[in-house]
């Protein structure tokens, strides 16, 4: 019990036992020598209450950090995981195309005919396929024409599907801000809110001039059917406007057998509305990956 007064609170204290007191003091001196810096370069920085440690350079750095953490960790946990059945969907489409002597495709939002295009391979592989490709933007439409100019089976049209024939503004990323978005050319929608959301993914507080509007020609469903006949497959990629286009298709008079559209940009309410409308019309609806939905007639035997 005599060692209680040897060392307390980091300093030697007088003790009735001289040996313990001396050894304790020696121990403290040795530890102090170990922790003592050997040179000025190895000096241990001391915390000063008046100094603040800055982890981020500015508010933009804070936003980027929070955004990255949210997207990478929180959102995947909240979303319902959908297995990727893209290969099954591709084989299903090929099987249906092969089983018919003629097959007609309508693609809404064809862009340049190559980028993320599910129709391109079908046209190249099967000679009995004919396609009508709608693309309202001037530059992608020009690329579409160059791609299919020597194929009489393909009809590119510079127009967008809408409720009536005429024109309306299409919102795109402005040319002055296109270098800030890696896929600026593919972000075009009748919904300005969708383009704003797409800009915020790569821009910090995009200004109003980051979004521009382009006047485009529109065509309705009835005009397309009267001119080109019934379509077997309709592929929709309208950047957030897919739900409205699903409701523009006349499912009572000459309905298509297969409809493929993007659900990733739709609200949950719009997803339910599209699925309910298609099921009431006799379609089987399947989300075959995290971005796309396939709706097909029951007799076609859609993969479950």
Protein language model features and the residues they cover:
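Intrinsically disordered, glycine-rich low-complexity segments
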Residues: 1-6
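Phosphate/nucleotide-binding beta-alpha loop and adjacent structural elements of enzyme active sites
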Residues: 11, 15, 26-304
């Amino acid at each position: 019990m005599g060692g209680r007064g040897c060392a307390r609170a980091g300093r030697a204290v007088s003790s009735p036992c001289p040996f313990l007191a001396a050894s304790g003091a020696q121990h403290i001196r040795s530890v102090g020598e170990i922790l003592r810096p050997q040179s000025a370069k190895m000096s241990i920085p001391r915390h000063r209450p008046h100094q603040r440690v800055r982890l981020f350079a500015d508010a933009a750095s804070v936003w980027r950090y929070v955004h990255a953490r949210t997207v990478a960790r929180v959102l995947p946990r909240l979303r319902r995981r959908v297995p990727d059945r893209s290969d099954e969907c591709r084989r299903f489409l090929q099987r249906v195309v092969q089983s018919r002597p003629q097959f007609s495709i309508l693609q809404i939002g064809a862009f340049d005919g190559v980028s993320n295009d599910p129709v391109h391979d079908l046209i190249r592989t099967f000679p009995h396929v004919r396609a009508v490709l709608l693309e309202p933007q001037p530059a992608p439409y020009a690329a579409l024409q160059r791609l299919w100019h020597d194929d009489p089976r393909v009809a590119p049209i510079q127009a967008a599907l809408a409720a009536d024939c005429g024109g309306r503004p299409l919102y795109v990323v402005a040319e002055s801000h296109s270098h800030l978005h890696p896929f600026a050319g593919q972000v075009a929608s009748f919904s300005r809110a969708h383009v704003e959301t797409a800009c915020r993914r790569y821009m910090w507080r995009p200004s109003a001039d980051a979004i521009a509007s382009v006047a485009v020609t529109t065509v309705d469903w009835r005009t397309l059917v009267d001119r080109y006949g019934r379509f077997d497959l309709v592929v929709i990629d309208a950047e957030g406007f897919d739900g409205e286009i699903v409701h523009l298709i006349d499912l009572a008079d000459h309905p298509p057998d297969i409809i493929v559209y993007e659900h990733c940009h739709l609200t949950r309410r719009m997803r339910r509305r599209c699925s309910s409308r298609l099921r009431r019309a006799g379609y089987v609806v399947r989300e075959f990956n995290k971005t796309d939905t396939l709706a097909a007639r029951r007799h076609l035997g859609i993969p479950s």
